[in-house]
Amino acid sequence: MRLLVLRGVDEVTVSSRSTVVIKSGNRVFERALRDVDAVLVVGSGIKISSSLPPVLALHGIPLSILAKGHVAVLLNPVGTKYNNYRALQYTLPKNKALAIALEYLKSRVRGMASIIRNRGGRLPALPEPPDPALYEDPARLESDIRSWEAAASNTLWDEVFKLLDPSAARELRERYGFAGRKPGHPDPLNKAISAMYAVLYTLSTKALVAAGLDPTYGFLHRTQYSVPLAFDYAEAFKPLAVEAALDLVNEEGLPTLSEDGDLDKDSLNKAMKRLYRYLSAKHRETGKTPYQQIHLKAFCLAKHLEGKCSREKLAFTWDKKRYIIHE
């Protein structure tokens, strides 16, 4: 995973069409773009040269910015109309598109359940997901998917938070007014999860583009997100970030926030290392890593639109016990 994460630097620019220049105080660093798959900027105080986005776009490298609780992913949209997979994506019947999005949500639910089960928590009873085959009206199907997802997620998050170290959980409630998973809430746990989610959105965008798909055209997420298909797709991989966040808090304590409200540089580095540990884990049977699956499942989605990959094979399900974790 060649992700360039920038936090606590002053300015990011380019010196040519192949090199990123990072300025921090009196120090200047250079990074060759051939060694970068994606760029994530964290914080609102970093000056970004106007020359950076077009140069990254030239290399097909997405630029993500996470600041003040929001993430935006920028990429080059040129040529999206001239690809067979994208043509199929744009003309996909709404019910079929929703059925695909549902598979990713079901995968996230299974992954969250595995975290609870593997850590000795109480696995709660969950509502049954809707069956797309029983629906003719896409509006009703979408409404039922959203209702099911909200109910299942709230139930699972309640149990996940019970897995936190008691002292950390108490500090979250008393100091930060913590009340569960809320992306914009100014507490260090939500900030850590959001930062890791931003990585998944960035990697998903890169994978979808490589597979010939348009990440700006989503199935369930709407256009208020910069890359709604990447948000749909990344649902399946979110349990990796949840697992990593639990490890971070339970083993190292709550992350530290900087003055701008985001994770400070040291805490961000720790969060990224925890996430990378799981992204690079090898499956005990297939030998594939979750990072590889982000790309492989994107190609499966493209093939599915042609009828060459079944819907059941679209999603990735995280289960820590099935992986070899490198310390």
Curated annotation (Swiss-Prot):
Enzyme class, UniProt record, top EC level: hydrolase
EC number: 3.1.-.-
Coiled-coil boundaries: none
GO molecular function: DNA binding; endonuclease activity; metal ion binding
Keywords (A to Z) from UniProt: Antiviral defense, DNA-binding, Endonuclease, Hydrolase, Magnesium, Manganese, Metal-binding, Nuclease
Biological processes, Gene Ontology terms: defense response to virus; maintenance of CRISPR repeat elements
Required co-factors: Mg(2+); Mn(2+)
Transmembrane segments: none
InterPro entries, per the entry: Cas1, CRISPR-assoc_Cas1, CRISPR-assoc_Cas1_C
Record-linked Gene3D superfamilies: CRISPR-associated endonuclease Cas1, C-terminal domain
Residue sites binding Mn(2+) per the record: E149, H221, E235
The keyword Hydrolase is assigned to this record: yes
Pfam families (UniProt xref): Cas_Cas1
Quaternary state and interactors: Homodimer, forms a heterotetramer with a Cas2 homodimer.
Function: CRISPR (clustered regularly interspaced short palindromic repeat), is an adaptive immune system that provides protection against mobile genetic elements (viruses, transposable elements and conjugative plasmids). CRISPR clusters contain spacers, sequences complementary to antecedent mobile elements, and target invading nucleic acids. CRISPR clusters are transcribed and processed into CRISPR RNA (crRNA). Acts as a dsDNA endonuclease. Involved in the integration of spacer DNA into the CRISPR cassette.
PANTHER family: CRISPR-ASSOCIATED ENDONUCLEASE CAS1 1
Family statement drawn from the similarity comment of this UniProt entry: Belongs to the CRISPR-associated endonuclease Cas1 family.
Name the record gives this protein: CRISPR-associated endonuclease Cas1
Gene transcribed to yield this protein: cas1
